[in-house]
């Protein structure tokens, strides 16, 4: 692409996140650190040159591991190394090379119909990051038209926040924007939207201490991780968070003979969550709600009527991602504290 340099002024414009559904009850806490961790010694290591940027069962695994393994994985920022801290034009980018994912990991014993559990143990942000306004991308792409802005940031290892501008500090809350397993297709699917296999979830709740559940579609599951964010708001309205290289440590295991799930679900000590993707927020919200009803009926033994009403009483619907066309992602969180046997 033709490079057009743009001078980035110190003054910035902040755009408030727009809430389109009932939200907030489980919104990410601002209290965090640059490096979040539950330390564990890894059994295997994946480097940032062991990558791909599609989802397909035809992609050969970079690693084969037994269920229960702990893996350390290094990931590029979203452009796969095309941007550096000295970059200035967000359109000077080959979109065919973005979202390099570290993996895939073949998990021994994983079969279609199983669930793959990925427990996030450590996340460490790199020393720089970037944000951008890219023409044609983002929730307000029509409003901003041809405007293009790329800002890069030095990230301080000793700090707990990003120095966005003078007097504006945004707490670190690192997570992987893309996580997923291989779909049951030979087609090479792009990593742009969220799908049933995971993909571009862009969900800032998926931090250390979260266990993410994926339906398994192919033998070995073929799990990959990437598109790291040092921080991001729910919805990712401008199309990017704080994109940064990152180090992940996660435990991966197969769950057999359990209940089946159709899309990604996750939990922490505090809540259980379901997700729904669709081309509209309304349909995504309906799917996330239906999956929560399924969970309450199958795991907690409630009637579907009681599960529906409890979801209305205690569940929180949130927009996780609203910009990765053609799909959007809505999540529902239900606090575990409402149950008498809560941990």
Per-range role (PLM):
Residues 3-15:
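Bacterial N-terminal signal peptides that target proteins for export
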Residues 78-90, 123-133, 220-230, 320-323:
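Short, Lys/Arg- and Gly-enriched loop/turn segments at beta-strand edges
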Residues 325-343:
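Long, compositionally biased
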């Amino acid at each position: 692409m033709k490079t057009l340099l743009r001078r980035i002024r110190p003054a910035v414009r902040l755009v408030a996140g727009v809430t389109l559904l009932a939200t907030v009850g489980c919104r990410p806490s601002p209290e965090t650190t640059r490096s979040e961790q539950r330390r564990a010694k890894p059994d295997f290591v994946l480097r940032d040159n062991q990558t791909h940027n599609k989802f397909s069962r035809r992609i050969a695994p970079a690693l084969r591991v037994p269920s229960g393994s702990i893996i350390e994985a290094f990931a590029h920022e979203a452009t796969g190394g095309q941007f550096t801290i000295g970059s200035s034009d967000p359109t000077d980018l080959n979109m065919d090379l973005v979202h390099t994912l570290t993996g895939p990991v073949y998990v021994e014993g994983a079969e279609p119909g199983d669930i793959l559990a990925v427990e996030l143990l450590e996340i460490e942000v790199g020393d720089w990051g970037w944000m951008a306004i890219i023409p044609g991308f983002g929730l307000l792409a029509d409003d901003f038209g041809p405007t293009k802005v790329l800002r890069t940031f030095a990230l301080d290892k000793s700090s707990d926040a990003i120095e966005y501008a003078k007097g504006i500090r945004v707490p670190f809350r690192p997570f992987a924007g893309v996580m997923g397993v291989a779909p049951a297709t030979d087609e090479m699917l792009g990593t742009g939207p969220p799908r049933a296999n995971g993909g571009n979830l862009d969900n800032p709740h998926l931090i250390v201490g979260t266990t993410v559940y994926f339906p398994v579609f192919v033998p070995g599951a073929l799990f990959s991780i990437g598109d790291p964010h040092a921080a991001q708001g729910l919805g990712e309205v401008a199309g990017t968070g704080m994109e940064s290289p990152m180090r992940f440590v996660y435990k991966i295991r197969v769950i057999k003979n359990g209940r089946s799930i159709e899309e990604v679900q996750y939990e922490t000590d505090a809540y259980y969550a379901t997700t729904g993707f669709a081309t509209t927020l309304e349909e995504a919200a309906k799917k996330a709600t239906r999956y929560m009803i399924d969970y309450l009926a199958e795991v907690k033994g409630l009637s579907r009527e009681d599960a529906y009403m409890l979801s209305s009483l205690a569940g929180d619907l949130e927009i996780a991602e609203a910009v990765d066309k053609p799909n959007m992602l809505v999540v529902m969180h239900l606090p575990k504290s409402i149950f008498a046997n809560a941990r």
